[in-house]
Amino acid sequence: MTDPLLRAHLAPEPRTLVDILRATADAHPDSPAIDNGREVLTYDELLDAAQELAAALRSDGVRRGDRVGVRIPSGTTDLYVAITGILLAGAAYVPVDHDDPDERARVVFGEAGVAAIVGTDLVIRSGPAARPDADPDEAAEEDPELTDDAWVIFTSGSTGLPKGVAVSHRNAAAFVDAESRMFLQQRPIGPGDRVMAGLSVAFDASCEEMWLAWRYGACLVPAPRSLVRSGMDLGPWLVANDITIVSTVPTLVALWPADALADVRLLILGGEACPPEIGARLATDTREVWNTYGPTEATVVACGAQLDGQPPVRIGLPLDGWDLAVVDAQGQRVPDGEPGELIIGGVGLARYLDPEKDAAVYAPMPGLGWERAYRSGDVVRFDGVGLVFQGRADDQVKVGGRRIELGEVDSALLGLPGVSGAAAAVKRTEAGNRLLVGYVTADAGFDPKAAAEQLRASMPAALVPRIAVVDTLPTRTSGKIDRDALPWPPPGASRGTGATASGTPDLELDGTAAWIAGHWAAILGSPPSAPDEDFFDLGGGSLSAAQLVSKLRERHPDVTVADIYEHPVLADLAQTLDAMAAPTGRTNAAVSPVPRDTQVAQVLGTVVVRSIGALRWLTWIGLGLLVAHRVVDAPWLPSIAWGWVLAGWLLLINPFGRVLLGAAAARLVLRGVGPGRYPRGGRVHLRLWLAERLVDEL
């Protein structure tokens, strides 16, 4: 009987990401590739822009096999032009989130040895490995090969420094093609689909978002960073932007009403454990919901399971091309149903930039007969249907979908002035949030707020913990720190800030401040102890800020996540809320689905709109026939009147005619429509939709 966990022999045919992009552009040249809400690039236009950037990179000395840094604001078209341009130049892109500290960018680009860095407005500057004497005339176009790297993504490292993981084109393209065999087999993804891009490009799951669109001719729709931070406000955005494909973390999906996903037909979850209620609530006959699993070291996703709402929530079976095994401490397979460490092999195995670490982590597994394998550190069991995630076997954790090595946080804490001992741990709050807490033993003059600022200057926000000062750090009999025994709630999140050991505030608050403090206590694990407490110093992040806003909107409907970032101090936030309009007791507005009659009308309207393109092609054919009759004696060719061809050229090909015809069509369709509010899916909505499509086609 074939082992369902061994699928390396089913790996897709070798090719590169450049091969995939060009094949899609050839098949769907006029389909939208990127729509950022302000501009739309077709696949032809994306390829042209990327080739222009690739040429500029070659002129600046970038050659095939080099690495190029990317640091461009999220949600912009330039970000994706940069990524595709670097790939077309034959180089690998090395992303750093635009919001990360400059020190993080310096470390990442230095460790990667980038030859150039592409920044805002696609400005290119030299990197640490630049070739200033390179001859632009020798910059021949050279496509990447299968063994060349496509991207290098840095993850949290146990030594205190981030680790660079290099993914080759063979790895990446195999992942993209293997996923095409998993999702939506009955109704494959295609040019009509719109894929949300909401993840930071420094997070490897962003690669899944991009290629879920670009593998099939669908449109990538970047979500504004402000909406991603707010969480709940992404729901209406999904509806307004006709999003049909979403890949995200369960924590974010939990903030959206089910109606916000009415048009979503594929929902992919990953990055953290998926609660059972997510699948039960969101899986429908018209929507596939998948729970996926995979470390960066094995190219984004190694396995997945379609959720049907029934427990247990599995991480499923491997992608075609990946091998999985569950082993004991001696590296031998365990019986089905028994827990063990998950080992990954196959075509998706990436590599570390550090050769020593690569050799240690991607080691042979003699007990499996594998020459190279990745030890995940995750404990799973195979229940006969698929793999079930059990937890971690080491000090690596996931918070908000981001993988974190507690050792890296420990090292950063120990580097703070006045700290003599440190240990990071993840604790769960009353609201179910996982909170990263840094416990330190320190001198009497230790300033936690200054320490937090120092950490923010050198680390991504997700790695900056809530700081709690303790007298001693508990240890096991082995002498190692016992992270499980670290106190929660903490005895003091910071000096003069935080809660007592009982979790009660050490300063009485009243009015709006007391009401906010109650929500802070549920979301962050303990209440603030003073009016000058800072939400983010107590461990708040983007997702917990979104949760706080959802609570505050019960009284103050106009509050946004931006208000939390602008007024993180308790007293300041309370004053801001008091200055807002009188509380109204707002409830979340339901997102109405488009009526089926309107959907049918849109399908019929699409046929009419597409016929305009067909007439344009017929005009070109007619023009070709007329020219052929003039230059070739071919009586067998069909004849056509000059008048019809001239009319078609004036209205459907000539730019001035197309503009006039588009304007006239829009005015005719929208005749009588004035400013105002109209129901979603109503006649005015349909007329606006048709006018927009007519103008786009013309």
Per-region residue spans from a language model:
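AMP-binding/adenylate-forming domain of the ANL superfamily
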Residues: M1-I153, V167, A174, P275-G279, ...
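AMP-dependent adenylate-forming
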Residues: M1-R7, T16-V18, I117-E142, A172, ...
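Phosphopantetheine carrier-protein modules
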Residues: D30-V40, V62-R67, G386, Q390-D395, ...
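Glycine-rich loop motifs involved in handling phospho/adenylate chemistry
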Residues: G37-L41, G69-T77, V96-E103, G198, ...
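Motif- and composition-driven signal specific to adenylation
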Residues: D78-Y80, A91-R106, D137-D336, E341-L349, ...
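AMP-binding/adenylate-forming catalytic domain of the ANL superfamily
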Residues: H98, G421, K427-L436, M459-I481, ...
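Terminal amphipathic alpha-helical/low-complexity segments used for targeting or macromolecular assembly
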Residues: G585-L698
